[in-house]
């Protein structure tokens, strides 16, 4: 997901997005552990999406606190 798409969301939607991404990442890790994951690059992409969403969430929370 692009940063511009994430910036358009509010804090509650971003928190839900992070939860969804963490669940997806967990599922991918389990598939990798059981040798069912064909595209291992999806792990990296999901991890980066999580980091991107958490960064924008922190920016929004910090901006709201000021």
UniProtKB/Swiss-Prot annotation:
Has UniProt tagged this entry with the keyword Transmembrane?
A: no
- Mind telling me which InterPro entries this protein's record contains? Ribosomal_uL29, Ribosomal_uL29_CS, Ribosomal_uL29_sf
Q: Where is the signal peptide?
A: none
MF GO annotations: structural constituent of ribosome
Query: A single Pfam family, by name?
Result: Ribosomal_L29
Single Gene Ontology BP term?
translation
A single GO cellular-component term from the record reads: ribonucleoprotein complex
Q: Which UniProt keywords apply?
A: Ribonucleoprotein, Ribosomal protein
To which protein family does this belong? Belongs to the universal ribosomal protein uL29 family.
Q: Which NCBIfam families match?
A: L29
What's the protein called, per UniProt?
A: Large ribosomal subunit protein uL29
């Amino acid at each position: 997901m692009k940063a511009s798409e994430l910036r358009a969301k509010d804090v509650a939607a971003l928190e839900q997005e992070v939860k969804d991404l963490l669940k997806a990442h967990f599922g991918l890790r389990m598939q990798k552990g059981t040798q069912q994951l064909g595209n291992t690059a999806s792990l990296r992409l999901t991890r980066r999406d999580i980091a991107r969403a958490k960064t924008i969430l922190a920016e929004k929370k910090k901006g709201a606190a000021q």
